[in-house]
Amino acid sequence: NSFLNFFPTTAVILDVDADHLDFFKDLSDVEHSFREFAELVPQGGLVVANGDDANTVETLRGVDYVSFGFREENRVHWANASEDFRTFDVICDGKPYCHVSLGVRGRHNAMNALAAAAVAWLYGVEAAPVERALHAFTGAGRRLEYKGRYNGADIYDDYAHHPRELHALLETVKTMGYRRVLCAFQPHTYTRTKALFSDFVQELRGVDVA
């Protein structure tokens, strides 16, 4: 709940899910905290949220927010996306806003870029600097971070410690053209592993060796 100590004028909610269950009681408890966070935004501020995520939509029921996502029902959505999600157009209120060409792969990175573009559009930023900034983003450490090559295999490090993050990671790897994928998974916290064990197992079944 440390984010409830902030004083946001703009709140961006990428998704809401059951996590940190050593602190939160359950998903409803998580949703309650995210709603409190959104309600910290003062009048005249902005709440920008993932309209594709059912938990987020439920959390913000009755809250005024701008939705972004891949579906056309969102005020900000994409079009003409490439197979690896690195390039796409951003459509805002039905009109083309900018063309995104990312230096990182993955549906989750595309969603994050959509969120950033949505905020920029709402604040009246022109398309060109948005395109430049998103193209220059090279990713965060331990997020599909290339570590080198060993015995002919490319080695990557990723901090994916939740089933949804693991799903996003492995879906991204599938777009990279590898013949075989091996995943060495280190569980992070006993509480999370116990609560989400079956979901972790389901995701790890998607690779050749885990």
Describe each region flagged by the PLM.
Residues N1, I155-H161:
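Switch II (G3) loop of P-loop NTPases
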Residues A140-R142, Y159, R164-V209:
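Active-site beta-alpha connecting loops in nucleotide-dependent enzymes
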Residues L4-I155, Y178-R179:
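Acidic, Mg2+-coordinating active-site environments of NTP-dependent enzymes
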